[in-house]
Structures are given as C-alpha cells and as structure tokens.
Regions:
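Juxtamembrane/interface helices at transmembrane-helix boundaries
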Residues: 1-7
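Glycine/proline-centered hinge or cleavage motifs at structural transition points of membrane proteins
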Residues: 8, 12-13, 71
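Transmembrane alpha-helical segments in multi-pass inner-membrane proteins
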Residues: 19-109, 115
C-alpha cells in the first residue's frame, strides 16, 4: 500500500480493509510480545511503554529501514550503541549534564529523511558486492490449466461508457466544462488536447478517482458517479496513469499481478495459513502471460523501479490487462516510448 494507494484502489484493492488487517495483525504480535515480556520479567514497569520509548522504537525502524527484518535489527543495534556513546561523551564535550542526545537524534532524523528515506539497509544493499548480498527468492511459477474468472464482454457496437455534460471545478477553475463522449465496444476513442486541458482530470472522473461537480458518467448502463474506483474496477474498467504509478522496490511480476487482484477470492486468513498458494500461482501465471504479451517477459524478476520510463508505461498496460477489463483507459500511454516500442 505504501506509495501506491490510488493505483491499488484503481486495481480493485480495498485499501482501508487492508490497512485495518495489517493494524490488527501488528496489534496481535504487539500484545503477544507484551504478554511474554510481563511473564518473563514478572514485573511491569511503565518506562518501556512510555512516549519517549515509542519515539525511540520508531527511530530504530526509520534508521534501519522498515522494509526488511535485517533493517530493523541494524537500526536497533546502531541506535542502542549511539545512545550509549552519546550519553557518555556529550556531557564531557559540553561540560554539563543534559538531554543532548535528543538534539543529536533529532538532527539525524532530519538528515535521514533527506538522504536515506528508506533507511540504511537498502543503501547497504546497493553498495554491497553481489556475492555478499542475500539471494533473491523468486516466486516459483508452475504451469497450470486452471483459468481465472473473466468479465462478460459487451456486444460489438454497444455503448460501454458514456459521459454526459461532465463538469469539474476546482474552486474558480473549471477543469472540464460540460464534456460528453461515448465509447462503444470494439472502438478506440482518443481524447486529444494540449497540456493542462483537463484530459487526466476527465480520466479520473471516468474511473472513480475523482467525482464530477455535475453531469453523469454511465458505465455498462449503470450510473457510477461517486462510486469508489475499486468498485468501478470490479465492473470491468481498468486504467493507466499520466504519471506512472508502480511499486518500484517490488518485482515487475508482482506489480503486474496487482491487476489480477479482483480475479482472486482468497482473503487474509487464507494467506496467513498458506491456503492461497494454488490461486496465487494462477494469478502469477496470468501476470506472466500479460508481460510476455507486451514484450517484458525477460524482466519478470527485475525491480520495477529499474526499468526505463517507457518500459514502466508498458508495465502499467500489462497490469491493466491483467484485470480482464471491458474498457481500458490509457492516459498518455506512448509518453516516453521510443518509435519501435510504440509500433510494438
């Protein structure tokens, strides 16, 4: 969810439910650790649970990086040693007692947010020799004959999407003024205009990312004004974005598999109990197929952030196709693509 909430919602992910599930699971682990602490110590001292200690724990996570277990271990180790060192030597330097380490840690947090927002562990991984880096555990994909659920496609020529006098105002600025259009099944319709004309704003209203000030948006005969983008996605509408929205630290395959989220049925508990592996394999096979379809089959396990801008746009198209859409909205899909990539 980090850094991709709008994209995740547009792919059908219920971000609120996912955040709530993560919060509850984290709370369970925190409760168990607190119980074990009390059982081991046979005495409860409020100091380890104070606000100051909470800030210290947060800084440990920020220092090492919250994306990995090794980052948390590195951050806690560095923080503990630094605090002890600062408490011993800062009073000698300044000649008096005081909470000088708090000032130093505050400055370090500012520097960390500027220079290493993801923590020190990801930085170490980039400069570490390949033979010392932890080996990537690629997701194993096995061939399967199982098929995913598909949307019922409209008949050729049928009106799939209609916008009727759609207007969007941002204060005194009118971004879209009574815009109307119709998209028929089997038709390619282009929305052309200069920069700042409101094309992406129109796309946001058609896909549920934004709500029109006035007018109607009708998809497959149903008015979808004000509906959440994930609900519209479940009806068969998928899209790409003007500014590429990917999860750069995840693999290309994992990014594209997000598009198939709605085509799976397993939930959080099935995932915790590892009962979703068969379905996950089917979803990953679909993601692999779409990547091969758009010419990115050689980059399955590469980090999405390492791709060129043009390849990232193609990745977005593969992700949108993974949802088996009835209608595909492509927002400036050729921007950043070379001639051969456009032709392909």
């Amino acid at each position: 969810l980090k850094g991709g909430q709008v994209m995740a919602e547009s792919m059908g992910v219920n971000t609120f439910r996912s955040k709530m599930a993560v919060f509850i699971i984290a709370s369970v682990f925190a409760s168990i650790s607190g119980w074990l602490y009390a059982h081991n110590q046979t005495f409860i001292n409020p100091t380890p649970f104070s606000l100051q200690m909470g800030i210290d724990y947060l800084f440990m996570a920020l220092l090492g990086g919250v994306g990995s277990v090794w980052g948390a271990i590195l951050g806690s180790g560095i923080f503990t040693m630094m605090r002890q060192w600062l408490q011993d030597y800062l009073p000698i330097i300044f000649g008096s007692q005081g909470q000088y380490e708090t000032i130093v840690f505050g400055l370090l947090i500012v520097a960390l947010m500027q220079k290493a927002p993801t923590g020190l562990w990801p930085m170490l991984m980039k400069i570490m020799p390949k033979n010392l880096k932890p080996k990537d555990r690629h997701i194993q994909i096995t061939d399967t004959t199982e098929k995913l659920a598909v949307h019922a496609m409209p008949s050729k020529g049928e009106v799939v999407l209609a916008a009727k006098e759609v207007t969007k105002k941002f204060g005194g600025l009118v971004a879209n003024n009574k815009m109307s259009l119709q998209v028929h099944a089997g038709e390619i319709l282009a929305l052309i205009g200069p920069n700042g004309a409101g094309k992406s704003t129109m796309f946001n209203q058609l896909s549920g990312v934004d709500t029109p000030t006035s007018g109607e948006v009708i998809f497959k005969g149903e008015k979808i004004n004000g509906q959440l983008s994930r609900l519209i996605a479940s009806k068969g509408l998928s899209r790409t974005f003007q500014h590429v929205k990917i999860l750069p630290e995840m693999s290309v395959l994992e990014n594209v598999a997000i598009g198939a989220h709605l085509r799976g049925s397993k939930g959080v508990f099935a995932s915790l109990l590892h009962l979703d592996r068969a379905e996950e394999n089917v979803l990953l096979n679909e993601a692999k197929y779409q990547l091969e379809r758009v010419g990115l089959g050689d980059y399955l396990y590469s980090e999405a952030g390492s791709l060129a801008l043009g390849q990232q746009r193609i990745l977005e198209i593969a992700r949108a196709l993974c949802s088996d859409p009835c209608l595909l909205l492509l927002d400036e899909p050729a921007a950043g693509l070379r001639l051969k990539e456009k032709q392909a």
